[in-house]
A protein has these predicted regions:
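Central cavity-lining transmembrane alpha-helices of secondary-active solute carriers
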Residues: 50-65, 254-266
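Intracellular juxtamembrane helix-capping segments at the cytosolic ends
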Residues: 117-130, 316-329
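Helix-loop-helix hairpin linking two adjacent transmembrane segments in secondary transporters
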Residues: 133, 140-191
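Primarily marks hydrophobic transmembrane alpha-helices of the MFS/SLC 12-helix fold
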Residues: 73-76, 280
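Extracytoplasmic gate region of multi-pass secondary transporters
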Residues: 27-28, 209-261
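Extracytoplasmic
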Residues: 8-40, 123, 229-234, 351
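C-terminal ends and interior cores of transmembrane alpha-helices
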Residues: 81-98, 286-298
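Interfacial helix-cap and linker-helix signal at transmembrane-aqueous boundaries
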Residues: 34-35, 66-67, 158-164, 237-238, ...
Length: 405
């Protein structure tokens, strides 16, 4: 048997992000179906999103405590098993249990556990691989979440057209095969240490570092800027253009994800010629312009173009911030990646919720809510411009005793 190499580890991590895209994006395509098939209110169905992100937040928080003790390989295998089992439970539990909604909640919690672990594990596994062009590889890695999202929406839509949406449980089982197969792959690929034993920073050390909190703000802004448009892109397309739900999904979140993927692949090929700070500043500028088009353009197609521009711009925000933090705090270890994932997920929850609440406050005007979303890229740009991160300096090395730099 040929000895597996870092490239195989990277391939397994690519599939890991595709798995996360499946567990995050598949169920929302079926919300209307769940409503009609099981007679569950849309409010209750919408709570599955809260369960999904809530469990992921909890996993992000706890992972910094147990991943280093258990090891990356068993945790990565477990993450994919949770994801696959959760998708199978989604297919069968609502039919088996007397209260279908309970089945949806249990399935969501199980696959969200897998998704949360994947989010914490995959980036540090790739960061530890012996690649020279770390930030380019990180950007390419995160593009696979975007391509996974495009694939889930497009292929699921095609399946529903050809086989009928009533057969969605079959598709859930098909999607479950991907994490199960990748769990086997992770049993064999090489896993490299992120930092030497005993040199990884403790959570308390990170919390005492001013630089760490700047990275937290950047991650919250990155998650909020991305999801504030992504989660509402379908509704924006449907309302603005008067198209069907299927077309709205393809023109909204599918186009948004494709633009994110394009940005991440492009940066993976050209990013070594830019400083991360410069690239992130360009991204925030494009994001601000895209939000302005979405919120203030009187022409619906220009608003949709604004959604696409936001997708293109936010593409490098999440992986770029992770790379910036990893380079600045090389002893951060698993705790750094787990807490950054937690901050990003907080942004993913807070941004869309704020947009929805403000839209409701202004008689359902989605543009008003999206206009509020401008706050996040503006804040991110301000942190990049005016914080100490703008200066070229040595990495932030943490003193384990007091957290000082």
């Amino acid at each position: 048997m040929t000895r597996l190499k870092p490239g195989h580890t990277l391939a397994a991590c690519f599939i890991g992000y595709i798995t996360q895209a499946i567990v995050v994006n598949f169920a929302p395509l079926l919300f209307v179906t769940f409503h009609s098939q099981y007679d569950i209110s849309l409010t209750v169905i919408g709570l599955t999103i809260t369960v999904n992100f809530g469990v992921q937040l909890l996993v992000d928080l706890l992972a910094s405590k147990f991943v280093d003790k258990i090891g990356y390989r068993p945790c990565a295998v477990a993450a994919h098993l949770f994801s696959g089992i959760g998708l199978l439970l989604l297919a069968f539990l609502p039919e088996i249990l007397p209260v279908p909604a309970v089945g949806l909640f249990i399935a969501s919690a199980v696959y969200a556990t897998g998704g949360g672990l994947i989010e914490v594990l995959i980036s540090p596994i790739v960061e530890a691989c012996p690649f020279d062009n770390k930030k380019s590889v990180m950007s390419l890695l995160h593009s696979f979440y975007s391509w996974g999202q495009v694939g889930v929406v497009a292929l699921s839509t095609l399946f529903f057209v050809l086989a009928g949406v009533e057969n969605w449980a079959i598709l859930a089982c098909v999607w479950a095969a991907i994490p199960f197969l990748n769990a086997v792959f992770f049993l064999f690929v090489p896993i490299y240490p992120l930092v030497k034993d005993g040199e990884s920073a403790k959570v308390t050390s990170l919390l005492k570092s001013g630089a760490f909190w700047l990275f937290v703000v950047l991650m919250i802004c990155a998650g909020s800027a991305e999801q504030s448009v992504s989660q509402w892109a379908s509704a924006f397309a449907e309302e603005g253009l008067g198209v069907s739900k299927t077309v709205g999904d393809l023109l909204g979140p599918c186009l948004f994800a494709a633009m994110m993927g394009i940005a991440r692949v492009a940066f993976s090929r050209t990013g070594e010629g830019f400083s991360l700070r410069t690239a992130l500043l360009i991204a925030t500028g494009g994001c601000i312009a895209g939000y302005a088009l979405c919120a203030f353009s009187p022409v619906a197609w220009l608003g949709l173009a604004g959604c696409a521009l936001v997708g293109l711009s936010v593409g490098i925000m999440w992986p770029g911030t992770i790379s910036l933090a990893s380079a600045g705090m090389p002893r951060g270890g698993t705790a750094l990646f787990a807490l950054l994932a937690l901050a990003g997920d907080v942004g993913c929850m807070a941004g869309p919720s704020a947009v929805g609440a403000l839209s409701d406050a202004f008689s359902g005007d989605l543009r008003t809510g999206i206009a509020f979303g401008l706050f996040f890229p503006v804040l991110m740009g301000a942190v990049l411009l005016f914080s100490g991160l703008k200066r070229k300096k040595a990495p932030v090395l943490l003193n384990e005793k007091d957290g000082s730099k």
